Amino acid sequence: MTASIKPGDRVSMTVKYERDGAIGIFTFDNPPVNPLTPSMHKQFFHAMQEFLADDQIRCGILTGAGDRAFCAGDDIKTPYKKSLNRQEELADHLWPHRNEGETPENFTWARDLVMVERYKPIIGAVNGWCLGQGFIYLMHLTDIRIASPDAQFGAPEINYGMAGVGGNTRLGRFLPPPVAMWMLLTGEPLSAEDALKHSLINEIVDKEDLLTRARQIAAMIAVHPPEAVRIEMEVFYRSLDLSKTDALAFTKHMYRMQRLGLATHGGESIGDMKFAYSTK
C-alpha cells in the first residue's frame, strides 16, 4: 500500500503541482538543475493521480524551476537501497514498494509513472537541460512540447553503463532511427534546433515566454469537450500499436460510443444524437 501525500506537505514538495483554472502545472523544483530523487518520483506519481482524477482540470503543463534545466535526470548522488541478493532483487522487481514506509529508498516509482494510462494532455515546457529520466518523462508523459533556444535533450545513461532504462522504448517513435541510435549509443545531446528539425518538439520559444506560451496552448485545448479530447488521444495512442485495419475499426467503434454516450454540451442532449460543436 502506498503512503498518501498530505495537503500540508505541499510546501516542502520538490515536485510542485498547482491548479490554474482548467490547467494543472507540474514543476520539478530541486535547484540548481532539478535532479530527481526517489521521493520526487513518488511525489510526481501522486500529483499525476490527482491531476488525472480532477475533472475540472482539462490540460497539464510539465516544466522545471529556474533557467538552467528542465531536469538533469536522476540524482545519482542520492543514496538508494540496493538488493542484497538475487531473491531480494526479484522481490523488489515484483513488489517495488514493499516495506517502503513514508520515504522511498529507490527509484521504482518512475516505473509506475511511465506506465500510467493517461488520456488527458500535457504540454512539456523545456527550459535548458533535459536529460536522463527527465527526458524519459518528457517522452512518456507529454504530448506537445516546446523548448527554449538553449534546451538540450539527452540520454546519457550509456556513459554510466545503464542501458535499456526506458528511453529507448519511446525515442524511436519520435525520432528517425539513426538519430535515436546516435543519442542512445553515444550519449550526446540533441540541441533545440535539431529537436525541432526532427519533430521531437513543436516550437522553440524564448525562455522568458516559455510558460506563457505553454499556458496559451493548454488553454486552446482546454476549451474543447473533454470527452472529445480523451477519445482523440486514446484512438491516437492505441492505434500506434494496431494494424491499419484494426486501427480503423477501433476508431469507428470509439466514434460510435462517443455519439451514444456524449454528455450534454451547449444545450444539446444525448437523445439528439448530435455533437456539441459550437458554430462560429
Regions inferred by a protein language model and the residue ranges of each:
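Terminal peptide-recognition signature
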Residues: 26, 43-44, 62, 75, ...
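An acidic, glycine-rich surface segment that forms the CoA-thioester-binding/catalytic face
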Residues: 43-45, 49, 76-127, 168, ...
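Structural motif
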Residues: 23-27, 61-63, 123-125, 146
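A short, well-ordered alpha-helical element
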Residues: 14, 36-58, 82-84
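Crotonase-fold acyl-CoA enzyme core
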Residues: 113-226
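STAS-typified acidic loop motif
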Residues: 18-42
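Short, glycine-/small-residue-enriched flexible loop/hinge segments at domain edges that mediate gating
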Residues: 29, 56-67
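C-terminal alpha-helix plus adjacent terminal tail
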Residues: 1-21, 30, 67-69, 78, ...
